[in-house]
Amino acid sequence: MKTVVSVSQGSSDADYELETEFLGQPFRILRIGTDGDLSRAEAVLESVRPQADAIGLSMIHDHYQVGREQLEHPETARLEACVPDIPVTTGAGLRGILQEWAIRHTQTELGHFFDNARVLFLNGQAGYRIARSLSEHTENLQFADPYLDFGVPRLLTSLTQLETYTRLTAPVMFQPMAVKAINALHHSPLYRLGEKLVSGSLHSAVQDSHVIVGAVGDLESFTSKELDGKTVITSRVTDSVLDWMRSRKVAMVVDYSPWLAGRPIGVNVMEAMISAALSRTPEQLGPDDYLDVIQSLGIEPRILYPNGYRRVNRFAFVIHPLSQQYLTKTPPLDWISSVSPPAVMNLVEKAVAYTPPFIYSKVSGIRSPTGEEAEGWLITVGGTPREIMAHGPEFTYSRLLAAAKLAKKLGAQIMGLGAFTKVVGDAGITVAKRAPLPITTGNSYSASGALWAAHDAVKRIGRVSIGESGKMAGKAMVVGATGAIGSVCARLLAKAVEEIYLAAPEPAKLLALKESIEQETPGAIVHVAGSADRDVADMDMIVTATSGAGKRILDIMRVKPGCVITDVARPLDIPAEDVAKRPDVLVIESGEIQLPGEPRMKDIGLPAGIAYACLAETIVLTLEGRFENFTLGRNIEWEKVREIYKMGLKHGMELASISGVNGVFSEEDFERVRVLAAQSEDEADPQAVAAN
């Protein structure tokens, strides 16, 4: 029987002894903790020397390879020198392989998990292999080595900085004079005075990160305030450690340590066992030796969820002021607007269009029934629709790309475009080609939400029946039918309504759309018109989806009583004063979506927990982990409209209470439209009046 001894600088309370079989050979494993006493560790090494076939050193500084620098810690070298005739290892060779594999395994298993994640290394030199692997998926790497080494509240923010820091500090780090100077600094009154500030700065860095890499012992000072929702990459996660993670609300743990005899063991122990089993020193072990052991034992990283399955994905969404009036709601512009004439505010509106993007609000609390969560940021670009349309596409492209750069830095894995930012130029295609993360316009869910809301409203008013074909026995019109959202609404309405009318000032595109719909939906009755006015009086349902930027696109006084108008456009196609003229018509502001969970964000002009459909599409894709360019350009695929609708249902999205320009519609509002429409019919039909 071969004997492997693990001499640890950790607590002796965790000592154990076990016998097991390894690579077909019987092994005895002995763990001896020395409670941080280096002299005691030397004595233990001397005492176990006659019986040990290999020795592992645990909870002591490893020999690190960082860039081209090889760090050899003098205390580790001192212990290794105690037993020159026996293989001694810290597990560095195997640890590097398991660390890197843990990252690649997790990224493959969970898909895009580390994309743009903000990662904090409590010891970057020890986690260098992890950092190199993560750098393939994110540039948002931070290293707290200056905190731990010198108590300096400064984070390194790249692998290059870590390598430079190591190159500069390694020659003096372990010199006796340097060690004394550092200890003296840590015990000086000046350092004690700023110690809380340094500690608070590190705690803040942990709270702002998405992934934490470090030993379990390095995490002890952090609470659920910092660790809630975080992913921790560490080793030797026992049941008690998992309970500790659970109490801190950690979302996920990646444990790269190997298991043996039903328990996690130190990587140093496993490498010492390999060395003893193969009768080679750790320096003589090669890649094939490690691969044979890993595969024969079935060792793989563990992905653990302390509080049940929980995955937190991240998004960004670009918004902008929809009118000059929106600018007056933001300090200090609210004060300026109160004392300035319109001419000054016009200049302010022009100036604000040139401001760089900034974070308007953090979004949190979105939880799917499946266990996924989404958090994100609303990023504002300054241009109103008037200013956006007054400039060429490149003006807006440059601001959207700046927003995408900010989103990536924040950790977003996908970015959505809102309102007029998604109709400029080629409707997102150019931005997606240049952006450092996936882009979606949200138009697929906007189309879905518009028809969802219209269908629900028509049913609740109850004036249109279902015909023999199974479709709505009535007429529906799409105004702005050749646009991105309008064309998809037209395709879907053709499958749900017996007769549809398409209105847009682009005859050639209308004819092509009509032809396409008739091929997709045999038997569909499709009419086309250059404007809405000619046929609007006969419609039971109207969807407006123009980019008119406030221009009047239909005469509401000609609309049929009881008609449901869904206004998808932003800014709205139908102004509030027009809506007030027709109490017998229901004008709804497209289909806003009720988000799952307990969403928290600043005011976006909707009731709490409700989002515009384009924002909801970005959130649905985030919850689904579909980090791809989903909806781009003006020709939306109706298959994607259907797909995003199904994904939304899966993640708990619901049609919100239908709203109009004056807020949420009540049952009394639907009844009012129903009654007034019936009265209008009676007044228009003398025979009906006589019968009454």
Kindly label every feature range from the protein language model.
Residues 230-244, 414, 557-596:
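ADP-ribose/adenylate-binding Rossmann-like module
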Residues 7-138, 142-151, 298, 307-313, ...:
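Electropositive, gly/pro-rich neighborhoods at or near active sites that engage anionic ligands
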Residues 152-217:
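Active-site rim beta-loop-alpha module in soluble metabolic enzymes
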Residues 63-104, 366-470, 602-612, 616-617, ...:
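Glycine/serine-rich phosphate-binding loop and adjoining beta1-alpha1 elements at the start
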Residues 253-323, 333, 358, 364, ...:
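Adenosine-phosphate binding glycine-rich loop
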Residues 1-25, 294-370:
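N-terminal basic/disordered segments at the start of proteins
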Residues 116, 125-181, 456-544:
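Glycine-rich phosphate/diphosphate-binding loop of Rossmann-like nucleotide-binding domains
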